[in-house]
Amino acid sequence: SLIIKTFYEVCNELGYGFLKKVYQNALLIELKNRGLQVSSNEKIKVYYKGENVGDYYADIIVNNTIIVELKATEFIVEAFENQLLNYLRGTDCKVGLLLNFGKKPEFKRRVFENKRKIRKNH
């Protein structure tokens, strides 16, 4: 996908060792340059029986449909994948990408489709 290609371009240009925020800013620039609609640090509200019980902040949301969670660690661990799935459960987004700007860049794609997604009752 275009997002994954852009991720690898940023990896190749910057290399390993920067803070996540540096990679996030570079990725935002490149995704915008490719004509994608992007927002960063979007608040995701978590609801329990219609009541807001907490908030998450997504690193990047692309075209209001894809949540992109960024890491700059040695490798992806299960807790990162669970975090992404929770973001998907709390939004209308069905696709999530976990991008790790580690020594060896890696990504995971997750899809979460469930009619019982945890959202505020309308």
Give names to the regions the model predicted.
Residues S1-Q37, P105-E106, V111-H122:
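Solvent-exposed, charged helical/coil patches
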Residues K71-K117, H122:
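Nucleic-acid nuclease catalytic cores
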Residues G15, V38, A58-I76, Y87:
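Conserved catalytic cores of phosphodiester-cleaving nucleases, focusing on short active-site segments
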Residues Y48, G54-A58:
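Basic/aromatic recognition patch in beta-strand/loop cores that engages polyanionic ligands
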Residues R34-G50:
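A short acidic/basic microdomain associated with nuclease active sites
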Residues N52-V53, F80:
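Short solvent-exposed loop/turn micro-motifs enriched in small/polar/acidic residues
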Residues E42, Y56, K103:
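Short beta-strand or tight-loop elements
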